[in-house]
């Protein structure tokens, strides 16, 4: 079992996110519980390329300071929505014999959606903790509607198990105990 923290970067981890305070608190709690229970925390960063703020070398590219990686925790960089394409993450997870991935981060309707669906297609058991992903309003949907659409309709029971933070922590504790 691993905890993926996807694209929780300085530029986009802001108070404009849907349920921002709850999202930040839940991800912090999950990172702490993962570390306490021997569940590896893995970070993924998105690079939009030259000329964009969300690119290597820019302040907004860095992982959100509230979720800062501990020494030795892995960071994989990507240029597309899926963290599994050309990043080394898939090979790393396979080399460790991982079967279960807990997905948290940003944005629900972009990279989290791709992470969930691609993780499922690669044969992982995908677990999505409630209110541990978020997004912004867009011209077609409010952030709230996007969150509900993906977490309650699209993923749950199809590509992922969308469950409470408490249930995820319980799974982490069981994982530690064997």
Task: Name the predicted role of every residue range.
Residues 15-17, 53-55:
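Short, glycine/acidic-enriched capping/hinge loops at junctions between secondary-structure elements
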Residues 48-52:
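Glycine-rich, proline-tolerant flexible connector loops at the mouths of alpha/beta enzymes
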Residues 8, 46, 131:
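Active-site loop/turn elements of alpha/beta-hydrolase fold enzymes
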Residues 9-15:
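Short acidic, Gly/Ser-rich segments with clustered Asp/Glu that frequently serve as metal-coordination loops
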Residues 2, 29-35, 54-178:
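Active-site-adjacent betaalpha module
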Residues 1-7:
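Short coil-to-beta-strand
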Residues 16-47:
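A short alpha/beta connector and helix-capping loop motif
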């Amino acid at each position: 079992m691993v905890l993926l923290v996807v694209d929780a970067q300085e530029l986009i981890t802001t108070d404009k996110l849907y349920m921002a305070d709850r999202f930040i608190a839940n991800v912090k709690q999950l990172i702490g519980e993962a570390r306490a229970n021997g569940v590896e925390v893995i970070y993924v960063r998105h690079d939009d390329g030259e000329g964009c703020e969300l690119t290597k070398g820019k302040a907004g590219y860095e992982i959100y300071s509230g979720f800062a990686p501990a020494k030795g925790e892995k960071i994989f960089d990507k240029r597309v929505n899926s963290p599994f394409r050309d990043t080394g993450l898939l090979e790393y997870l396979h080399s460790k014999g991982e079967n279960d991935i807990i997905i948290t981060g940003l944005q629900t309707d972009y990279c989290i959606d791709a992470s969930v669906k691609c993780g499922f297609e690669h044969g992982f058991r995908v677990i999505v903790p409630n209110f541990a992903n978020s997004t912004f309003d867009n011209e077609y949907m409010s952030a709230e509607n996007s969150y509900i659409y993906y977490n309650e309709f699209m993923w749950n029971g199809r590509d992922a198990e969308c469950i409470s933070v408490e249930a995820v922590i319980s799974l982490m504790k069981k994982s530690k105990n064997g």
